[in-house]
Amino acid sequence: LTKQIKRGKSAMEKLGEYKMEILNRCLGSQTLAKLLKYDSEDALDKPDIEMEDTFSLMHTRVFPYRFVPNTIDEQGTFLTLGVNGFRRYQEGFQVFDDYQAGEIYFYFFTHVDIMRTDHGVRQDLMLAEISKLFDGTKGIGMGELKLRYLNELWIHNNKFGGYAVSFTVTDFK
């Protein structure tokens, strides 16, 4: 038997592309960029951030991998990405060998001293924006991204709080 050569990339081969598309969407959102960049209560009332300035958040407040910076003494807000559970796509008891599905995780958290903003709780505002940007949208994998999980996230002895939220991405194997 010979293995059939496939054309195109699998979902796992495209993970890097998916993550960069996700981060570009996040950094393109003035709401997320302001909540990440400005630690003040009036973060959303600040002037819009220039595109090149939003990309300066990469690897300082935004990370394309699951990374928790050593932030115990530093106040700030952070957004990181992770992946989990990539597998053959299954619906009910039927498994589809031609497709893969998995979760893209957003981890975002903020120091307890800067959670409050003039417009609400910082991580709640971020959650609403991430949901708006990704839930039910297309452009990553085939079909729509679908909300999979949402869990509260507390780290560094409860000095930082936020959420872990995941969306299912499905693509060809």
Q: Which residues make up each language-model segment?
A:
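Small/polar-rich, solvent-exposed N-terminal microdomains that initiate assembly or binding
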Residues: T2-G92
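A general secondary-structure signal for short beta-strands and their flanking turns/coil
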Residues: E74-G76, D97-E103, N158-A164
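Active-site-adjacent structural patch at catalytic or cofactor/ligand-binding sites
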Residues: G82-D113
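Short, solvent-exposed secondary-structure capping/transition elements
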Residues: Y89-F93, I114-G120, G139-E144
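Extracellular/virion structural assembly segments
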Residues: D97-Y99, F109-L133
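Acidic-leaning, charged glycine-interspersed low-complexity segments
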Residues: V121-K173
